[in-house]
Curated annotation (Swiss-Prot):
The keyword Zinc does not apply. Its main location: membrane. GO terms for cellular component: plasma membrane; septin ring. This is Septation ring formation regulator EzrA. It comes from the Bacteria. It comes from Geobacillus kaustophilus (strain HTA426).
């Protein structure tokens, strides 16, 4: 029974699928039929009718015939073939030959797609032909007007174009022939070729118009402005030489001649209508001439700089030499009281050597200025280097003088530090005396002796002649560590002794009742009398905490309260 239901369901499913699939295939046939009808109704005949309004000769006639034949072939042959294929597809569906029907429908769709492209191309080409004719007709009149204006300008202002006028005349005459060529092609129905003539003519007239705008300006530059600037440079150069400027390194006469030759090249380019090249040459010439002006101006500025800086540098070097002598005397005096490191002495000798070299260089420059055989720009460069080196040497000299002055300051600071550490040591001893300890532990006594020895070492270093400040600083560091360590140990020892004593006193209340407490406290007292305060505190705390946990915390709290009241 179950198997029968399965067979029944499968059969029903197959019937439903077959029905749905056939329906889908028929919808595809309807879609392709509609596409075919749409293609047949395209307005190709109307578009071709527009072509008949043109001159039906030459190229236009050939194109029209080709488009008409293409359209006739589509309507009379290709679309009827599509119709037959659609009928074939329907017959295949009726016979349930779905695979063959699907393949045929795919072929029909591909064919319609190709026909769609062919129809689109016909319409596009027709519109292009008609559009080019309309556009060319409008543009040719604009070009005629532009050509007339150019001819008129050339005639009226011929002198402003120089030798280029003849070639411009030739080019405009050649352009005029293109108008006749356009008319002939249009008359012959060759509208696309006529369109090419319009585009070529438009480009040529654009170039000629641009040239006619640029040529007068370029001729003005090459015939008037640039030669005048070169003449001005030549006059300025001669005048500066007469005033004593050394300008041989500029090679001005040769350079000016090169610029004149470049101007001649530019004029030849203008004559040949190589306008873009001529514009580039003129731009380069302007930059190069500006650079020549800058060179002459730099010489004038350099002359002013040399005249101003020479006296100033002379005074600077004299002042520096005087300061160096003072520093030398100061260094000799300081050496009697302080030890100078070899590097410091070498630095001073280097400063002296640099000063002599700078003075020598200055005198050489001074001689060259007097000889008047060196360009001021070169002298300026040397003086700028000299100024930079003088500033550097002044900085090094000032650092050395500061170091000498610092030595005395460092000594005073070292003595102040020594006094401070002595006070710290005295304060530690005062605390010990105030605490009335029965005695001092041996480790503490050794630390105390070490602190005193370190302070004596610093004092001895400060009495040495010459004074070696690095050695003093080293001794100070060692003394500082020893004194600080002793002071901390003092505070710790007094605290341990006081707490040990108070803990023993607190534990006395349990001494009679608890033999163990009595024994622990007696041992703590023994350690206290033998100056072992740390161990005495540990022993006393252990004994008391045995019978009263937290007792040491209460002892500490009471001691801290007493300290607060005393302070």
């Amino acid at each position: 029974m179950g198997m029968a239901w399965i067979v029944l369901l499968l059969g029903a499913g197959a019937i439903i699928y077959n029905h749905v699939y056939r329906k889908r295939m028929y919808r595809e046939i309807d879609r392709l039929e509609e596409w075919k009808i749409n293609l047949m109704n395209r307005p190709v005949p109307d578009e071709l009718a527009k072509v008949k309004q043109l001159n039906m000769t030459g190229e236009t006639e050939q194109l029209f015939e080709r488009w008409r034949q293409q359209w006739d072939d589509i309507v009379a042959v290709k679309l009827p073939n599509v119709e037959e294929q659609l009928f074939d597809a329907e017959r295949l569906l009726d016979k349930y030959r779905y695979r063959q029907a699907r393949r045929l429908l795919g072929q029909i769709a591909d064919g319609l797609r190709r026909l769609e492209e062919e129809v689109h191309e016909i319409i596009h080409e027709v519109n292009e032909l008609i559009g080019s004719e309309e556009q060319s007709r409008a543009e040719i009149e604009e070009l005629r007007a532009a050509h007339r204006e150019a001819k008129k300008a050339l005639l009226a202002y011929r002198y402003t174009f120089g030798s280029a006028a003849d070639l411009l005349d030739v080019r405009l005459t050649e352009a005029e022939k293109q108008f006749q060529r356009f008319a002939e092609l249009t008359e012959a129905g060759n509208y696309l070729a006529a369109r090419d003539v319009v585009l070529t003519l438009k480009e040529e007239l654009g170039r000629l118009t641009a040239m006619m705008e640029e040529i007068p300006k370029l001729l003005g530059e090459c015939q008037t402005s640039l030669p005048a600037q070169l003449a001005e440079l030549a006059d300025g150069y001669r005048e500066m030489e007469e005033r004593g400027y050394i300008l041989d390194h500029l090679h001005m006469e040769r350079t000016l001649q090169e610029k004149r030759e470049k101007i001649e090249q530019c004029l030849a380019m203008i004559h040949e209508l190589r306008i873009e090249e001529a514009k580039q040459i003129v731009a380069e010439l302007k930059e190069e001439i500006d650079a020549l002006y800058d060179l002459l101006e730099n010489e004038v500025l350099a002359h002013q700089y040399v005249q101003t800086e020479m006296p100033r540098l002379s005074g600077m070097l004299q002042e520096l030499a005087a300061e160096a002598k003072e520093t030398e005397a100061e260094a000799l005096f300081v050496q009697q009281s302080y030890h100078l490191a070899p590097s410091d002495l070498e630095k001073y000798r280097s400063i002296e050597k640099q000063l002599h070299q700078l003075q020598k260089r200055f005198f050489l420059i001074q001689d060259r200025v007097a000889e008047a055989k060196t360009a001021y720009s070169l002298l300026k460069e040397e003086l700028e280097q000299l100024v930079s080196q003088i500033d550097l040497m002044k900085e090094e000299h000032e650092q050395f003088r500061t170091m000498l002055q610092t030595l005395r300051k460092d000594e005073l600071i070292a003595r102040e530090k020594l006094d401070g550490m002595r006070k710290t040591l005295a304060e530690a001893l005062r605390l010990v005396q105030k605490s009335r300890l029965p005695g001092l532990p041996e480790p503490y006594a050794l630390e105390l002796a070490e602190a005193r020895r370190s302070l004596q070492a610093v004092a001895a270093r400060l009495e040495e002649k010459p004074l070696d400040m690095p050695a003093v600083d080293q001794a100070l560091e060692e003394a500082k560590a020893a004194v600080e360590r002793l002071y901390e140990r003092t505070v710790e020892m007094i605290e341990q002794a006081t707490l040990a004593e108070r803990t023993i006193q607190y534990g006395n209340r349990y001494r009679r009742r608890y033999p163990a407490v009595r024994k622990g406290l007696e041992e703590a007292e023994f350690l206290f009398r033998h100056y072992d305060y740390e161990e005495a505190l540990r022993q006393a705390v252990a004994a008391v905490e045995e019978v009263e946990p937290g007792a040491f915390d209460r002892v500490q709290k009471l001691w801290q309260e007493d300290n607060s009241r005393e302070q």
